[in-house]
UniProtKB/Swiss-Prot annotation:
Protein name: Taurine import ATP-binding protein TauB
Organism, as annotated: Shigella boydii serotype 4 (strain Sb227)
Classification via SUPFAM superfamilies: P-loop containing nucleoside triphosphate hydrolases
Record carries keyword Nucleotide-binding: yes
CDD domains: ABC_NrtD_SsuB_transporters
Any single Pfam family the record assigns to this protein: ABC_tran
Main localisation: membrane
Family statement drawn from the similarity comment of this UniProt entry: Belongs to the ABC transporter superfamily. Taurine importer (TC 3.A.1.17.1) family.
A GO term for molecular function: ATP hydrolysis activity
Organism domain of life: Bacteria
Domain ABC transporter intervals: 2-229
Annotated catalysed reactions: taurine(out) + ATP + H2O = taurine(in) + ADP + phosphate + H(+)
InterPro entries cross-referenced by the UniProt entry: AAA+_ATPase (IPR003593), ABC_transporter-like_ATP-bd (IPR003439), ABC_transporter-like_CS (IPR017871), ABC_transporter_ATP-bind (IPR050166), P-loop_NTPase (IPR027417)
CC per GO annotation: plasma membrane
Length: 255
């Protein structure tokens, strides 16, 4: 379980997050949404252990987070892949740094690439891949270390609408198969409503938790309902419009 208690953080000398309290249970998919500048990415970087926080506590499985760790896998919008390495070696790179022997890490890479739909692409280079394929490699790399918690920072923001829909459904299937805790940062309201088991709305900066909304659309999808059917459901449309109105309220307040 991820537990965040009374978290305060600065960014560039200015308050970024104020009194954040969140809990992410095992097997849940938490989505954080808010206007630009609300501290979404700062929150993810704090959980990942990339930057220090001023006050409060972040704990995963009862252990305080004070730096990066293999129990947390991170996927970024820009992927951060190594262009001089092929797909297989990109996925296995972290395992190599961890001292895992070659045959084992290549087998792990093969298995996670199969999970993300890239079986057979092991020897291709990053420049030979589409944007969606590169994000699949980024997700596979994060999964290779078998983390407890998967953190994703707007991973589909630069993709076209069709590819973004494919990646959303892939992530939901991986979430169902692995049972991992997932925290997704996004600025896309429809994506947030579709994918979250709990949606957290942040205020304009400094970010505070405005509202926490339990949702069931992701569970409906993994139970077999199509994304098209879900997104055309009046309940989904009403929730999307409600969330949109809350985000607009914050944008107007900030401006």
């Amino acid at each position: 379980m991820l537990q965040i208690s009374h978290l305060y953080a600065d960014y560039g000398g200015k308050p970024a997050l104020e009194d954040i309290n969140l809990t992410l249970e095992s097997g849940e998919l938490l989505v954080v949404l808010g206007p630009s500048g609300c501290g979404k990415t700062t929150l993810l970087n704090l959980i990942a252990g990339f930057v220090p926080y001023q006050h409060g506590s972040i704990q995963l499985a009862g252990k305080r987070i004070e730096g990066p760790g293999a129990e947390r896998g991170v996927v970024f919008q820009n992927e951060g892949l190594l262009p001089w390495r092929n797909v297989q070696d990109n996925v296995a790179f972290g395992l190599q740094l961890a001292g895992i022997e070659k045959m084992q890490r290549l087998e792990i890479a093969h298995q996670v690439l199969k999970k993300v739909g890239l079986e057979g692409a092991e020897k291709r280079y990053i420049w030979q891949l589409s944007g969606g394929q590169r994000q699949r490699v980024g997700i596979a790399r994060a999964l290779a270390a078998n983390p407890q918690l998967l953190l994703l920072d707007e991973p589909f923001g630069a993709l076209d609408a069709f590819t973004r829909d494919q990646m959303q459904t892939l992530l939901l299937k991986l979430w169902q198969e692995t049972g991992k805790q997932v925290l997704l940062i996004t600025h896309d309201i429809e994506e947030a409503v579709f994918m979250a088991t709990e949606l957290v709305l942040l205020s304009s900066g400094p970010g505070r938790v405005l509202e926490r909304l339990p949702l069931n659309f992701a569970r409906r999808f993994v139970a077999g309902e199509s994304s098209r059917s879900i997104k055309s459901d009046p309940q989904f449309i009403a929730m999307r419009e409600y969330v949109l109105s809350r985000v607009f309220e914050q944008r107007e307040a900030f401006s």
